Amino acid sequence: MSGVKDKMLVGERFRRALCSYPESAVVQEAMARELVSMVRLHAGEERLGRVLEIGAGSGLLTELLLEAFPVASLTANDLVGECREPLREIARRLRIAEFSFLKGDIEECGELPGSQDLVVSNATLQWLNDLDKLFAAVRRSLVPGKLFAFTSFTVGNMEEIAMLGGGGLSYRTTEEIGEIAGRHFELLELKESREQLTFSSPREVLGHIRQTGVNGLGGERWSRSRYLDFMENYSRLFRVQGGVSLTYRPLYCVLRRREL
C-alpha cells in the first residue's frame, strides 16, 4: 500500500506553504491546465451542475476549471482548513451559486456528497493510502455516465531526492493505478509524463520543495553534516546545463462511471 501515515505533518507543511504555493508550483499548475483540457475533451461543453474537488488547496485547479465550465455548485475538500476562504473567494468571483467546503482527510470523510456531475483532483492522490476505497466512494458520489478526472505522481517522481535519502513517498506505478481504477470505472484516458526543472543550486531545490509543501514526509531535522553531504552529492550527481535538476513524473487519468 502506498500513501503516507502522518497526514497531520502533511497538512502542516501545506499550511505553511499556502501563500507561496501558487507561485512556486509550476509543475502542478501545468498539470491542472492539462487536466482541464482532458475534461473538456471527454465532457464537451456541457454544463456541470455539481462538482466535487478533492485536495483543492490554494485553488490552482479550482480557478481554471470554473473559468472553463459553467458550474452551479462546488464542493471543495482539503486537509487544511485555511484553504476555505481563498476557495470561497474564487467561487464568489466566478459567480458560482453554491459553495461548500469539506474539511479534512478525504479518506476519513465518510460518504462523499452525492449526485456529482464531475469529481476532480490535482496532485493529491499520491498522499492517500487506500485508492481502492476512495475510488469506490467517488463512484458512488457520481451520477452514472459522469467523469472522475485526476492527476497524481508516479514512480520516479523527485527521484533525485529519494536517491540521496532525502525522504519521499512510495509511488504507485501507472499500471497499478490503472488496474485499481478499472475495478470501479470505465477508463477513458491514462498517461504519464516527465518534467524536469532546473535550479541554480541544491539549496534552491530545497527551497522549491519547502515552498510547495511537498516535503510532507520526514519530520526529523538534518544535522549540519548530513545537510552538507546532501548539497555536495546533489551537485555532483544531478548537474545539468544551468544548474541542477529536479524531476517530476506527473500522471493524468480520466474515468467514467459506467451507466446503470
From Swiss-Prot:
Keyword Transferase: yes
Keywords on record: Biotin biosynthesis, Methyltransferase, S-adenosyl-L-methionine, Transferase
Gene3D superfamilies on file: Vaccinia Virus protein VP39
TM helices/strands, residue ranges: none
Reactions that this protein is recorded to catalyse: malonyl-[ACP] + S-adenosyl-L-methionine = malonyl-[ACP] methyl ester + S-adenosyl-L-homocysteine
Enzyme superclass (EC): transferase
Family from the record: Belongs to the methyltransferase superfamily.
Protein name: Malonyl-[acyl-carrier protein] O-methyltransferase
Organism for this UniProt entry: Chlorobium phaeovibrioides (strain DSM 265 / 1930) (Prosthecochloris vibrioformis (strain DSM 265))
Primary gene name: bioC
